[in-house]
């Protein structure tokens, strides 16, 4: 999930033809906002809070590439500040309007073992390759 945030930041430095992110909390984490006070030395909580610098900078990045965000919708732990997949809120995962959003009925952990997710990723890769063949560019 955090790989999607890293990839988004990389778009400022590297030409990227397209991307698929999985359960990325692009708007940050409400849980991290309060958890960082209980574990102040845990860097993850400081970096993924809703008002953290990495999250705010990510929100300012405008995408002009094909990007698919897979949104995991099952789990729903009660202390995450809204409907969630056990780790990230669905609202945070769906916060970007410049991406294709695809919901899958999995928890944050199941999503990585999903045949459906593999199919989505391979489909997006095939479309990218086909576009390259048709236009001789990516």
Residue ranges and their predicted role:
Residues 1-66, 77:
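Serine-dependent carboxylesterase/thioesterase catalytic core
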Residues 62-138:
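C-terminal catalytic-base region of ester-bond hydrolases, centering on the histidine
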């Amino acid at each position: 999930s955090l790989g999607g945030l890293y990839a988004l930041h990389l778009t400022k430095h590297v030409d990227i033809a397209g991307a698929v992110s999985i359960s990325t909390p692009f708007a940050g984490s409400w849980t991290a906002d309060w958890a960082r006070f209980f574990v102040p030395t845990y860097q993850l909580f400081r970096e993924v809070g809703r008002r953290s610098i990495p999250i705010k900078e990510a929100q300012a990045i405008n995408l002009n590439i094909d990007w698919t965000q897979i949104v995991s919708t099952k789990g729903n732990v009660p202390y995450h500040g809204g409907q969630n997949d056990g780790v990230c809120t669905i609202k945070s995962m769906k916060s970007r309007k410049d991406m294709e959003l695809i919901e899958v009925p999995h928890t944050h952990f199941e999503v990585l073992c999903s045949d459906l997710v593999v199919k989505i990723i391979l489909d997006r890769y095939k479309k990218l390759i086909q576009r390259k063949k048709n236009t001789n560019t990516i």
